């Protein structure tokens, strides 16, 4: 007892420490209160539980977690291990308390303990509505190997079982009846469910496991069953059917086909074992009592094995009326529909009406008109994936081109009754649509074409003794009899001679090939030739009738004879020679008219050509006139440019003379030298400047003797400034007068520069050497113009030999 109490105390301390780290403060208070109650009231029961837990631990068991209210804790991040179904692998940090309780109960059951199993929770798979398998996994579990070496286990949900006659399909030349929920099966394709059963055939990792090999042995199994659908097919019957296939893969595919009813659906003796169970639902306790667990665990077989659908028709009833199942029987599908009450809608499972809609993606998916118009489509389909199918024309007329006599009579009768109401006409016909009725009515021949084949009896051919021509009808080819022999003798070959009506054929051809006026001329001339005899006969008959007006009896007899003769003449056809004469007259008239039109068109062409030439000449004249105007404007521009050039040259010479005379008092001789140097361009300016400098020094020495104190006189300086300004004004007036006159012959540049150099030196009036040097002053007076201003006069003390030249 002391050892058990010590063990119990350790367990209590361990329990308190674990709960304090896992629960919240509120939960800790509740647990402490529960522990106090257990310590006071249930000490003996706790000791028994601890002893039982110790025994389980010694036998390899695990202590159950007493905290049944603790939820499952997993990591937030995980790795995706399957794309379909979407599976994410997460690490479980703490499993759910119910899971631990179930595991503890299973382990307790292994050692013979059954206490506490009645209160175990029932775990249900919410995804598929089945009991979750926890401990038992069969050897052939559906594992899909991943590229990274991992595997993902997933479960295929059972299909909803649909009762009915089944779906009839063609398996080659044989008939294959499938359940309603197995309508996805097709011999030439592989469905998603099949890829989940044997994924190794579609991974591409092994050369022996390919989709083609899977379809080969799958179709071999189905073909083996279809050969004798009344017999239940087993795996032993299919041994040696296909070589090179693993027995496990073969067995798995066989069980899959059997589960879905693709095989053994119409077999008479079906043996479908239920889900395998290792332990019976009824169990016996150690005390000898028998009990039934409330939530017995099931294996994973319950998720892939389900109740087998039952076919209402036996195999003998379906296939007994088909002695030879070959593709040559045209009414094979019709007889199958008669036995199986036609197909059913894949949405509402009702029998299909006469008109239904078929899927283009999968030809076995059918919809009735109500489901299609209300948008109740199969998953993965839309209205664009379905086409309208009419079984009335499925095996016969596809486009409605084949009409029977009865349908044609109904169409004509409906047209008479309902006029242009084609909806009622189509309803009256019954087997054709509105568009087909309209198309067939337009294709019907008119009455004239129908009357061509009618044979009229009692018509005799008469001969005309006057011209010896046999008046017979046309032959089958439309040729005129009697003309072939005559035409062979004639040398003239005329067109359309073999047509039934050569004249009208010629007129029609001319109307389509040439102008309408030419064709009208041809027709008019032909008719005039044909009606010439008629006019002559009518004039003769009018004369005879006038002579018979003498007696009443004779008049009545003549009128009677005239009417009889007119009737006889109206019935007699035209002679062949008259037809050919009209033919030739029409051709000649057409040729003449065409020649006149051709001449007129030629004259019109000549007139238009002359107009074109005249317009081209006028166009050239206008261009030449524009060129003359452009040349005149160009000459004016050239004159303006020449004036501008001369003005720039004068300005340049004046600027150069002003620059060289600016140091003070350059004589006119210096200006003349500068003008000569600029005009010739060959003299040296430096030598001239040196000579001028020497002359200035020589004049400076003789200046006081000539006009003493002149340079210091302010009155003389003022007069010299005024004279310089007046000289500039006169030069500007001369330049304006030269620009006003028209240009004459072009002057050389040296003459322009010489005149400018001799007259454009305003600083010559300020040179003291000219005032003191008579020779220099005389030379300057020769080149400079005279000034006639009244205020300008000679200074006092200056003689006539001063040389200023001022008046």
From Swiss-Prot:
Binding site for Zn(2+): 345, 348, 368, 371
Biased composition (Acidic residues): 28-54
Outcome of gene disruption: Plants are viable but have alterations in leaf, root and flower development, and are early flowering.
Expression across tissues: Expressed in roots, stems, leaves, flowers and siliques.
Disulfide bond entries: none
InterPro entries registered for this protein in UniProt: Homeodomain-like_sf, SANT/Myb, SANT_dom, SMARCC_C, SWIRM, WH-like_DNA-bd_sf, Znf_ZZ
Primary location class: nucleus
Keyword field: Activator, Chromatin regulator, Coiled coil, Developmental protein, DNA-binding, Metal-binding, Nucleus, Transcription, Transcription regulation, Zinc, Zinc-finger
Domain of life, source organism: Eukaryota
Gene Ontology MF term list: DNA binding; zinc ion binding
Low complexity composition bias: residue spans: 692-703, 726-739
Single GO biological process annotation from the record: chromatin remodeling
Subunit architecture: Heterodimer. Interacts with SWI3A, SWI3B and BRM, but not with BSH. Interacts with MORC6 and SUVH9.
UniProt-recorded name of the protein: SWI/SNF complex subunit SWI3C
């Amino acid at each position: 007892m002391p050892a058990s109490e010590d063990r119990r105390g350790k367990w209590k301390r361990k329990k308190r420490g674990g709960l304090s780290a896992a629960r919240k403060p509120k939960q800790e208070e509740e647990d402490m209160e529960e522990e106090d109650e257990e310590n006071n009231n249930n000490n003996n029961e706790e000791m028994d539980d601890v002893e039982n837990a110790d025994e389980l631990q010694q036998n390899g068991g695990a202590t159950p977690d007493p905290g049944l209210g603790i939820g499952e804790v997993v990591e937030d991040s995980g790795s995706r291990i399957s794309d379909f179904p979407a599976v994410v692998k997460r690490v479980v940090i703490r499993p759910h308390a119910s899971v631990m309780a179930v595991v503890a109960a299973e382990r307790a059951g292994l050692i013979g303990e059954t206490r506490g199993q009645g209160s175990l929770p029932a775990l249900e798979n919410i995804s598929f509505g089945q009991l979750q398998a926890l401990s038992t996994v069969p050897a052939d579990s559906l594992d899909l190997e991943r590229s990274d070496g991992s595997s993902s286990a997933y479960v295929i949900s059972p299909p909803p079982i649909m009762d009915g006659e089944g779906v009839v399909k063609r398996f080659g030349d044989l008939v294959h009846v499938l359940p309603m929920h197995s309508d996805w099966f097709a011999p030439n394709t592989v469905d998603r469910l099949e890829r989940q059963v044997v994924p190794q055939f579609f991974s591409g990792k092994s050369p022996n496991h390919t989709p083609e090999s899977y379809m080969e042995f799958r179709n071999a199994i189905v073909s083996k069953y279809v050969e004798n659908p009344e017999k239940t097919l087993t795996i032993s019957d299919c041994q040696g059917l296909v070589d090179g296939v693993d027995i496990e893969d073969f067995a798995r595919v066989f069980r899959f086909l059997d589960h879905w009813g693709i095989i053994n659906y119409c077999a008479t003796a079906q043996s479908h074992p239920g889900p395998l169970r290792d332990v019976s639902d009824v169990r016996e306790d150690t005390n000898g009592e028998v009990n039934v667990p409330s939530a017995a665990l099931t294996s994973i077989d319950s998720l892939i094995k389900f109740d087998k659908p039952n076919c209402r028709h036996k195999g003998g009833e379906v296939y007994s009326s088909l002695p030879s199942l070959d593709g040559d029987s045209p009414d094979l599908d019709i007889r199958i529909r008669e036995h199986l009450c036609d197909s059913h809608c894949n949405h509402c499972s009702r029998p299909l009406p006469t008109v239904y809609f078929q899927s283009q993606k999968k030809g076995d998916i059918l919809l009735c008109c109500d489901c299609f118009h209300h948008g109740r489509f199969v998953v993965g389909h839309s209205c664009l994936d379905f086409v309208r199918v009419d079984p009335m024309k499925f095996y016969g007329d596809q486009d409605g081109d084949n009409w029977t006599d009865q349908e044609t009579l109904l169409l004509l009768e409906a047209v008479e009754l309902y006029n242009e109401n084609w909806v009622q006409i189509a309803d009256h016909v019954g087997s054709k649509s509105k568009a087909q009725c309209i198309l067939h009515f337009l294709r019907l021949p008119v009455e004239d074409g129908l009357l061509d084949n009618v044979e009229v009896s009692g018509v005799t051919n008469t001969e005309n003794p006057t011209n010896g021509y046999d008046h017979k009808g046309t032959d089958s080819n439309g040729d005129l009899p009697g003309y072939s022999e005559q035409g062979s003798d004639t040398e003239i070959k005329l067109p359309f001679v073999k047509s039934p009506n050569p004249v009208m054929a010629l007129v029609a051809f001319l109307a389509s090939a040439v102008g309408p006026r030419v064709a009208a001329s041809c027709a008019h001339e032909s008719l005039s030739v044909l009606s010439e005899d008629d006019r002559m006969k009518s004039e003769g008959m009018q004369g005879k009738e006038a002579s018979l007006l003498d007696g009443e009896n004779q008049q009545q007899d003549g009128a009677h004879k005239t009417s009889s003769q007119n009737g006889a003449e109206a019935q007699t056809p035209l002679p062949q020679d008259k037809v050919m004469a009209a033919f030739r007259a029409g051709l000649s008239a057409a040729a003449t008219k065409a020649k006149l039109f051709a001449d007129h068109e030629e004259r019109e062409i000549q007139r238009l050509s002359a107009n074109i030439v005249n317009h081209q000449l006028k166009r050239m004249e206008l261009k030449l006139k524009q060129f003359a105007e452009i040349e005149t404007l160009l000459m004016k521009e050239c004159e303006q440019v020449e004036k501008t050039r001369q003005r720039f040259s004068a300005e340049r010479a004046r600027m150069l003379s002003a620059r060289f005379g600016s140091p003070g008092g350059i004589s006119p001789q210096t200006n003349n030298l500068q003008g000569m140097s600029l005009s010739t361009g060959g003299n040296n300016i430096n030598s001239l400047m040196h000579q001028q400098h020497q002359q200035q020094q020589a004049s400076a020495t003789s200046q006081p003797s000539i006009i003493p104190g002149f340079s210091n006189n302010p009155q003389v300086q003022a007069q010299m400034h005024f004279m310089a300004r007046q000289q500039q004004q006169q030069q500007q007036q001369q330049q304006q007068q030269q620009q006003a006159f028209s240009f004459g012959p072009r002057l050389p540049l040296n003459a322009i520069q010489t005149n400018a150099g001799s007259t454009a030196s305003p600083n010559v009036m300020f040179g003291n050497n000219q005032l003191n040097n008579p020779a220099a002053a005389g030379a300057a007076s020769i080149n400079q113009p005279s000034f006639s201003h009244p205020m300008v006069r000679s200074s006092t003390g200056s003689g006539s030999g001063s040389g200023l030249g001022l008046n």
